[in-house]
Amino acid sequence: MTITNGKVSLKHLVTMETLSNEEVLGLIQRGIAFKRGEKVELDRKYYASNLFFEDSTRTHKSFEMAELRLDMGMIDFDARTSSVNKGETLCDTILTMSALGVDICVIRHSEVDYYKQLIDSPTIQTSIVNGGDGSGQHPSQSLLDLMTIYEEFGTFDGLKIAIAGDITHSRVAKSNMQILKRLGAEIFFAGPEEWYAEEFDVYGQHLNIDDIVETVDVLMLLRVQHERHDGDGGFSKETYNRLHGLTEERYKRLKDTAIVMHPAPVNRDVEIDDSLVEAPKSRIVRQMQNGVFVRMAILEAIVNGKA
């Protein structure tokens, strides 16, 4: 599948499922163009607010950087000092932002599907960009992952991609398995069986990491999401690393052309050996870099939808 020129216009971006293949590829194309230095002048001043109700470094700060690069006005929001602490609902918070003239709200929230009430509201005019909804979806992370893969291989068709780790609790995994399958990749899963659900079988086969490490083009590691587990009393970092992580021994068995990805933050010496985070096959830092450019593309598409 190739990328062709095309203008992407979006009202909201809340899941990967709402995007057509053409829109996905168009956003990747714009991300690559921004990375190459392309400039864009918006037709007016647009205002964005980043509302993060869960901790974030990369998503939060890369959206801020994307907004700055597009010369958008940023309306500060800190959940710790907002009226949320007085009992204000998320819907009323966003209704307020809309009334103030905020054009785009980037939101991360622990509630899965939090965005549904917002995009269905007849009075909220601001566009919603989902920065992660609990263990639901993470579309902007998925798009930066796709951009990173496309830069490397120039296609998705026929690529063998393994998603390895804490799959059940990962919004990144859910977004990626759906879109990568749709774009023609062959998906495999690896990791503890207790963190895997049968519903994922429609996308790919669950195997031991040692059975797939030599054949995959992309090894996409996932963070162990301790904060979403009921209890980690029996969890051992050493055991996880030995059974499911990317060790130096497994790294040596990867194909010469294979790449290693991780959405970060990385639990070093758990999902991946500390020595491998910046190894030659690792694209973890590039993913972070691409996050700025693909989020510029997302914001531009939202602006296009308002023109």
From Swiss-Prot:
Q: Which InterPro entries match?
A: Asp/Orn_carbamoyltranf_P-bd, Asp/Orn_carbamoylTrfase, Asp/Orn_carbamoylTrfase_sf, Asp_carbamoyltransf, Asp_carbamoyltransf_Asp/Orn-bd
Has keyword Transferase?
yes
Q: Name one GO molecular function term.
A: aspartate carbamoyltransferase activity
Kindly state which keywords UniProt assigns to this record, in alphabetical order: Pyrimidine biosynthesis, Transferase
The catalysed reaction is:
carbamoyl phosphate + L-aspartate = N-carbamoyl-L-aspartate + phosphate + H(+)
Gene Ontology cellular component annotations, sorted alphabetically: cytosol
Listed binding positions for carbamoyl phosphate are: R58, T59, R108, H138, Q141, A264, P265
UniProt xrefs under PANTHER family:
ASPARTATE CARBAMOYLTRANSFERASE (PTHR45753:SF6), ORNITHINE CARBAMOYLTRANSFERASE, MITOCHONDRIAL (PTHR45753)
Q: How does it assemble?
A: Heterododecamer (2C3:3R2) of six catalytic PyrB chains organized as two trimers (C3), and six regulatory PyrI chains organized as three dimers (R2).
What is the protein's given name? Aspartate carbamoyltransferase catalytic subunit
Organism (species): Streptococcus suis (strain 05ZYH33)
Q: What high-level taxonomic lineage is stated for the organism? A: Bacteria, Bacillati, Bacillota, Bacilli, Lactobacillales
Gene (UniProt): pyrB
